Amino acid sequence: TRRDFLRKGAFAGLGMLTMSELAKAVVSKQNGNVSPKIKLEKDSVILFQGDSITDMFRKYDCNQCNTPEQMGMGYALFAASTLLSDYPDKQLKIYNRGVGGNKVYQLRDRWELDTLAIQPDVLSILIGVNDFWHILMGNYKGSLGIYERDLQDLLHYTKEKLPNVQ
């Protein structure tokens, strides 16, 4: 429908804006090399994790890396396409495990299977829209403090389990 088209177009536009900032922060080129902030080795595993902005209509039943179906239609797809095109010799393995509607505690609930089991070398997390939005809608009793605490706890837990993750 027209409404679906407009909704998807708005999300894709937001994803493209987000991707450009993510690309600047995560992967930048300096004389043809990857920025020292993120080191991509041969066979590096990259994981995009988060809520609907990451999800962007990905197919949940597709678990293969580097496929458009599991990348969705947002910034994860654009970033993966760029990385795979720019660094074909690195044979990167890129996954998207974003789930629409998720808040930080829901991300934590699926962390073992959807993050730690993948063993990413590089992890990108984009989460927080629903933590705020659902408070405004009266569907969630969270707060900024809960969001910050839950996210910090998740990051610390991840570094304990995957000490070399970037």
Enumerate the predicted regions with their spans.
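N-terminal export signals
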Residues: 4-27
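Solvent-exposed loop/turn segments at secondary-structure junctions
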Residues: 52-55, 99-104, 129-134
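Alpha-helical cap/lid subdomain in secreted, periplasmic
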Residues: 78-93, 106-166
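Flexible, glycine- and charge-enriched loops at secondary-structure boundaries
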Residues: 65-73, 101, 137-145
